[in-house]
Structures are given as C-alpha cells and as structure tokens.
C-alpha cells in the first residue's frame, strides 16, 4: 500500500490503524487529564435535558456519551466520524450503555450532512487539528448550530509558560511516538499526532478563526499550563 498522498488520507489511515488502542493511549498521553478537561467543559456548556447536539470527529465516542447522558432520553445526540473503525468502538460503548438517544454516523466534518440551524450544541474534541481545512470545519459547525447555540472545541494548544513549553514539545516529539510504538505498535501514527499538535494554531489564533467563521462571541479556557484549550463560540440569536 502506498503512502497516503493528502492530509485527509493520511489522517484516515492513522485512525483506522490505532482505533483499538486509542482510548488507552489518549489517557497515557494526556496523563488522564483529558477527562477532567471534558468534564469542566461540559459544566461550562450547561447542557439541558431534551436538547440536541452534534459531536463532530467523535472518534470512539466519549464526548458523544457525555452529551447523551446530559440530554437524556428526551434529547438527541449524533456522533459523526470518518473512521469506521473508530466508530465501531463507539457503537460498542453505546450498546453497553443502552443510549438510545445517541446515533452514530459515518461522515465527513468538511461537509456536514445536516440542515442549517439544526443543533443546540456542536462539539469537536481533539479532532480539529486533524481535518484538511480548519476554517471549512468551523464554518460548517457554525452553519448547523442553531441561533443562540454553542460550538465547542477542546484541542491541544501551544503552551505559553517558559520551560513548560520546551518540556511539552520534547514529550510530544520524542516520548509520545515511543509510547505509541510500545503500547499501540504504531510509531508512525503517533509521530503524525505530534506533528498535527505542533502545527495547530495557538489559542488566540484559534479564537480569531472562530470569530472569522461568524461567531458573535468566543470564550476561551486553558488547561494544564496551556497544553490544551477550550473554545466556546456563541452564534447570535436571530
């Protein structure tokens, strides 16, 4: 099999290969912090029973599940991802938890298959850095969220603390691929993940991108010395 030629093909290849070890590696890479980041973000979102959400690049479904538990049986959550293997893990979790309000869809974040103004919330967790075009996906999420709704992104960021920054880059460049090789047998795939994290915009740059996509207001929150950040974009009420 030849080397994937585009970013989209390369990312698809990565996640189709690491899906079975993704959850355990995610916990190791973030020192278990990703769960607390998502929990804090959910608190800030204040999701209510009966509401609707779309989780873009849902992967193995952890954020989709948190959203499903928040909206309850009267709400609706759709988790969308382009990796069928990642979705297979999410489907097993859904079945185990009997979450009838959760629907899992194989689809493309660059062309969301939904009408304008469809969801109260649209989320993307650690997926934006992997899409071919950040702005296209932000504009798509803006399009499908309802007026007065929120688009929320949790993503790796560029640390600003002196010393912390150097340690972060060392960890991502040298340690993470080795962990990937030892645990997931996937050195090349985890090398890609550190590349995508290194090249991703800082939190201020991402805030500007949210505003350029049309959002009326954007809130930011840094986590763990700036290694990750939450951006919450508000779509103006009509």
From Swiss-Prot:
Pathway: Quinol/quinone metabolism; menaquinone biosynthesis; menaquinol from 1,4-dihydroxy-2-naphthoate: step 2/2
One Gene Ontology MF term: demethylmenaquinone methyltransferase activity
Major enzyme class: transferase
Gene3D superfamilies for the chain: Vaccinia Virus protein VP39
Similarity remark: Belongs to the class I-like SAM-binding methyltransferase superfamily. MenG/UbiE family.
Reactions it catalyzes: a 2-demethylmenaquinol + S-adenosyl-L-methionine = a menaquinol + S-adenosyl-L-homocysteine + H(+)
Domain of life: Bacteria
Keyword S-adenosyl-L-methionine annotated: yes
PANTHER family named in the record: 2-METHOXY-6-POLYPRENYL-1,4-BENZOQUINOL METHYLASE, MITOCHONDRIAL (PTHR43591:SF24), METHYLTRANSFERASE (PTHR43591)
EC number: 2.1.1.163
Protein name in the entry: Demethylmenaquinone methyltransferase
Binding-site positions, S-adenosyl-L-methionine: 60, 81, 108-109
Protein role: Methyltransferase required for the conversion of demethylmenaquinol (DMKH2) to menaquinol (MKH2).
SUPFAM superfamilies xref list: S-adenosyl-L-methionine-dependent methyltransferases (SSF53335)
A single BP term in Gene Ontology: menaquinone biosynthetic process
Keywords, ordered alphabetically: Menaquinone biosynthesis, Methyltransferase, S-adenosyl-L-methionine, Transferase
InterPro entries: MenG_heptapren, SAM-dependent_MTases_sf, UbiE/COQ5_MeTrFase, UbiE/COQ5_MeTrFase_CS
